[in-house]
């Protein structure tokens, strides 16, 4: 038996779709399905495949989103972020953008020996953003 770890990156949007992000949501939902299918195909070979679903992480992608929002609203970026959290992500309980390091910590665990009984799972790194018990 071999040994390996694969972690696919999806998004909160895979579990909690938004009408203004339909193509992105559909693509990220497909990532979850792919991870689950691959996990079933390769677990017997010792290759454990899982996924993570981050939400609103401070990154170049969300920086650009918030810059565009700030320009549209004619406000500073910090105000655009606050507006986004209040109006678009009211269930994000921590009321802040996540950090890349927080997602990396979960991925590091999933790539370690400590995750030897974790396969086909999706870990939400979402600050409480997904307003359901969906898995």
Locations of regions flagged by a protein language model:
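Short, flexible catalytic-loop segment of classical short-chain dehydrogenase/reductase
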Residues: 15, 54-64, 68, 72-73
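Short C-terminal tail/terminal secondary-structure segment
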Residues: 16, 107-108, 119-135
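Residue(s) in the substrate-gating loop at a strand-loop-helix junction
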Residues: 11
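Short, small/polar-rich loop/turn modules that mediate ligand/substrate recognition or access, typified
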Residues: 43, 48, 118-120
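A short hydrophobic alpha-helix cap/turn motif
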Residues: 42-44, 57, 111
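Active-site helix of classical SDR
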Residues: 27, 35
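C-terminal helical subdomain
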Residues: 51, 75-114, 118, 127
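Active-site loop immediately N-terminal to the catalytic Tyr-X3-Lys motif
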Residues: 16-22, 44-45, 95, 113
